[in-house]
Amino acid sequence: MNPLVAATSVIAAGLAVGLAAIGPGIGQGTAAGYAVEGIARQPEAEGKIRGALLLSFAFMESLTIYGLVVALALLFANPFVS
């Protein structure tokens, strides 16, 4: 295995996980803030807001999991290694 390919794969795996976590992290923080604001304005709609919030958290977190899958593929099933 070429050491340059191995080193680049490790760096790319770290970047994949790190960059894949930035967007969902910001999105989850923003969504949680607006959910708290919405519950404060309409306490009777708490159940609907919480359900929509948890569903959106699941979709946002799936993006981070995709980044993790790409990182694991680069580390353990690297297509660039012959």
UniProtKB/Swiss-Prot annotation:
| Secretion signal, residue range per the UniProt entry | none
Checking Pfam families in the record gives: ATP-synt_C
Example GO molecular function: proton-transporting ATP synthase activity, rotational mechanism
Q: Name one GO cellular component term.
A: chloroplast thylakoid membrane
Transmembrane stretches, start-end: 3-23, 57-77
Xref: SUPFAM superfamilies: F1F0 ATP synthase subunit C
Q: Which InterPro entries match?
A: ATP_synth_csu_bac/chlpt, ATP_synth_F0_csu, ATP_synth_F0_csu_DDCD_BS, ATP_synth_F0_csu_sf, ATPase_proteolipid_c-like_dom, F/V-ATP_Csub_sf
Name its cellular compartments. Plastid, Chloroplast thylakoid membrane
PROSITE patterns for this protein = ATPASE_C (PS00605)
Keyword list (alphabetical) reads:
ATP synthesis, CF(0), Chloroplast, Hydrogen ion transport, Ion transport, Lipid-binding, Membrane, Plastid, Thylakoid, Transmembrane, Transmembrane helix, Transport
Membrane topology summary? Multi-pass membrane protein
Where are the coiled-coil regions? none
Tell me which residues are marked as the site Reversibly protonated during proton transport: 61
Q: Tell me, in a sentence or two, what this protein's role is.
A: F(1)F(0) ATP synthase produces ATP from ADP in the presence of a proton or sodium gradient. F-type ATPases consist of two structural domains, F(1) containing the extramembraneous catalytic core and F(0) containing the membrane proton channel, linked together by a central stalk and a peripheral stalk. During catalysis, ATP synthesis in the catalytic domain of F(1) is coupled via a rotary mechanism of the central stalk subunits to proton translocation.
HAMAP family with a match to the protein in the record: ATP_synth_c_bact
Q: What else is known?
A: In plastids the F-type ATPase is also known as CF(1)CF(0).
The record's subunit annotation is:
F-type ATPases have 2 components, F(1) - the catalytic core - and F(0) - the membrane proton channel. F(1) has five subunits: alpha(3), beta(3), gamma(1), delta(1), epsilon(1). F(0) has four main subunits: a(1), b(1), b'(1) and c(10-14). The alpha and beta chains form an alternating ring which encloses part of the gamma chain. F(1) is attached to F(0) by a central stalk formed by the gamma and epsilon chains, while a peripheral stalk is formed by the delta, b and b' chains.
Similarity comment text for this entry: Belongs to the ATPase C chain family.
Return the protein name.
ATP synthase subunit c, chloroplastic
Encoding gene per record:
atpH
